[in-house]
Amino acid sequence: MYPFGSGMPSHPPTSTNHHEPPRAPFGAGWVPPMQQNSPYPPPSQPHPHSQPSSQMHPQQHQQYPGGAPAPYPPMSAPYPSAAPSYPPYPTSNPYPAQYAPPAHNHYQQPSVSNSPYPADRGYTPAMTAGYDAGYGYGNGQGHGQGHGHGQGHGHGHGQGHEYGHGYGQGYGHGQGHGNGQGHAHRSLPAHREGTPTVVPAANFDAVKDAHDLRKAMKGFGTDEDALINIICRRSNEQRQEIQRQFKTHFGKDLIEDIKSETSGNFEKLLVGLLRPIVDYYCAELNDAMAGLGTDEEVLIEILCTLSNMEINTIKNQYLRLYGAHLESELKSETSGNFKRLLTSLCTAARDESGRVDPVAAKNDARELLKAGELRVGTDESMFNMILCQRNYQQLKLIFQEYEGMTGHSLEKAIKKEFSGDVMEGLIAIYRCVTNKAEYFASRLHKAMAGIGTNDTQLIRVIITRSEIDMTDIKVAFERLYGKSLKSWIKGDTSGHYKHALYALVGEQRSS
């Protein structure tokens, strides 16, 4: 399984005693960029470097204006404490070290190569280092097995350590937890979300696949079934190796051949599958902001569901591909509270430790209540700070506390207090925390419900989730809507396009 949820920590908080086992970003098919093959030009080819604004984010210790008297007794200790449970918004570059762009003054647009795998892209299929056991970040911090601390430390770490993906320095138990504070931080077992429908093919032979694809497109006519059986039944990493072998053996670009031999949504699907997954995300974001108008739903779907590592990787690659900073593009295409929400998400500052603190959760629930339903108007900055910073396990606890205090869900409160795109963004975060499979099932349903089909949305969700959790999404879809995902695909698509979608969602061809 290759979960895709809260993701890997970009820089583990120093106050955290346990880290949730990191998850492979972008699913099975992604190979992390090689550190020696930076996607950025060398120092002789500088590019712009933006410094995060210290005024961009609300202060952690923000006080609320007067109004309705507080319905709760004052806390015996302020929140956050002197040793905060969660990392503040960064005041320096938020990129992990291996993804941080150098502080150059100018960016030089990279030259276009005929090869689909330029060395400086860092997505070469030969890349093998990175996310095996231990999930090290290049600093030797991934220790694989053997870091289980067992029972009896008194710090609530009795579960979850069997994963052994520790960071060494993060396991200090002398931080004062459980020393008469009245509550202990505890770490929950990682939520092992996700069963993919597309997995790396066994006995993979890229050379044979390249020759079979060439044979399927050579001469008169095209063997579309052969294209489906190869392209739709390989992981993204394997597809990149096939493309390289195709160009090596035939001197042709596989994507260009696919474009010349197919058309419509079938072509769009195959071309999307052949792109490196990070490039695909970048293209979807760029298309959403290109031309007149902005497709806010695409921005929400991508930025509200990815981990820090994934967002930072996309930001770096977006700069390389389009010569512009993603955050700047988002600011120019959005406005108001929605712009501030996307800016917070783009900063990629979420705590990903997996640690939960019941007292802090109750405090956060109170703050959300005071920022929304207990005042005239809404303090959106508090919603931004909590929903964009807290880890998923902590957010689940916050949501439970909020419902216990009010008798209704935070989602209902968000719908009451917000409207438009910012409401949709906050609800997307809420639903991803509570049940990510159901969130993406709703995205698939929306793409096919009503008159016509939003094929772009249908293709994007299936491509990006097929190597992550599409099996879970299928189960959620049938539970929510009473019919199988396959039956909906059958009713809304046709021909080879339909059969390719069947293959990607793990269904047998029936008609």
Swiss-Prot record:
InterPro entries: Annexin, Annexin_repeat, Annexin_repeat_CS, Annexin_sf. Residues 138-149, 165-181 have a biased composition (Gly residues). Annexin repeats lie at residues 204-275, 276-347, 359-431, 435-506. Residues 1-76, 93-123, 138-195 are annotated as: Disordered. Pfam families: Annexin (PF00191). One of its GO terms (cellular component) is nucleus. It comes from the Eukaryota. Residues 106-116 have a biased composition (Polar residues). GO terms for biological process: response to calcium ion. Keywords: Annexin, Calcium, Calcium/phospholipid-binding, Repeat. The keyword Zinc does not apply. GO terms for molecular function: calcium ion binding; calcium-dependent phospholipid binding; phosphatidylserine binding. Residues 47-67 have a biased composition (Low complexity). Belongs to the annexin family. A pair of annexin repeats may form one binding site for calcium and phospholipid. This is Annexin B11. The lineage of its organism: Eukaryota, Metazoa, Ecdysozoa, Arthropoda, Hexapoda.
